[in-house]
């Protein structure tokens, strides 16, 4: 869940576009819905557009020439701040293959090769300014119990957290120290 906004979010969405007109129309539509342009340090040569939703949460409208997300649906990626080790952790934790592992950046995608990617941008990592506004929720797959899934996560390097952020979920921290909630079953 969302907490108080303190600086740039460590997780944001990347939306894909199919043409320059689509990128322009998507930006215009999101601005009509209350979005706003935001500067997160992008350069003048960047071809993606960075917006913030009405609550100030950043999202990127990706240019149509971006080949990395070209096979993804409109929600191209959930982009996370994190190390290369974190990408490998999540690949093992959820059983999705690494589809990118270069220059300390990593990404995973469902084994079918379809759907959005989970990406980690590598260093330098953003400063942690209190609680992250957003965090991942995971559910055990394939009829596994939450306790069995938690034991797997702990074996991969996750640690238990005393902090309970979500009702009905087990709180833990991934290998980069990010809050994660393990829910009993997919919702």
Show the residue positions of the predicted features.
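Short, positively charged, low-complexity/disordered linker segments
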Residues: 130-144
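Vicinal oxygen chelate
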Residues: 31-92, 97-129, 140, 150-187
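Short hydrophobic/aromatic beta-strand micro-patches
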Residues: 14-18, 79-81, 137-141
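Ordered, small/hydrophobic-rich secondary-structure cores
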Residues: 1-38
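Short, solvent-exposed loop/turn segments that connect beta-strands within catalytic domains
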Residues: 6, 21-22, 112-115, 129, ...
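Short, solvent-exposed beta-strand edge segments and adjacent coil->beta transition regions
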Residues: 8-12, 73-77, 131-135
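Short, conserved charged micro-motifs
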Residues: 20-26, 85-87, 143-149
């Amino acid at each position: 869940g969302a907490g108080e906004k303190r600086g740039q979010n460590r997780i944001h969405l990347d939306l894909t576009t199919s043409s320059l007109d689509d990128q322009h129309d998507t930006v215009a539509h999101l601005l009509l819905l209350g979005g706003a342009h935001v500067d997160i340090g992008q350069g003048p040569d960047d071809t993606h557009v960075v917006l913030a939703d009405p609550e100030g949460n950043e999202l990127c409208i990706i240019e149509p020439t971006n080949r990395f997300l070209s096979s993804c649906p409109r929600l191209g990626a959930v982009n996370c701040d994190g190390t290369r080790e974190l990408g490998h952790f999540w690949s093992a934790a959820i059983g999705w293959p690494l589809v990118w592992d270069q220059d300390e950046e990593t990404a995973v995608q469902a084994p079918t090769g379809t759907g959005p990617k989970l990406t980690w941008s590598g260093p330098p990592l953003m400063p942690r300014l209190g609680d992250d506004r957003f965090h991942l929720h995971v559910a055990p797959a394939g009829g596994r119990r939450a306790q069995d899934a938690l034991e797997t996560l702990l074996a991969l390097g996750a640690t238990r957290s005393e902090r309970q952020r979500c009702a009905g979920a087990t709180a833990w921290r991934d290998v980069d120290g990010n809050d994660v909630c393990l829910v009993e079953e997919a919702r």
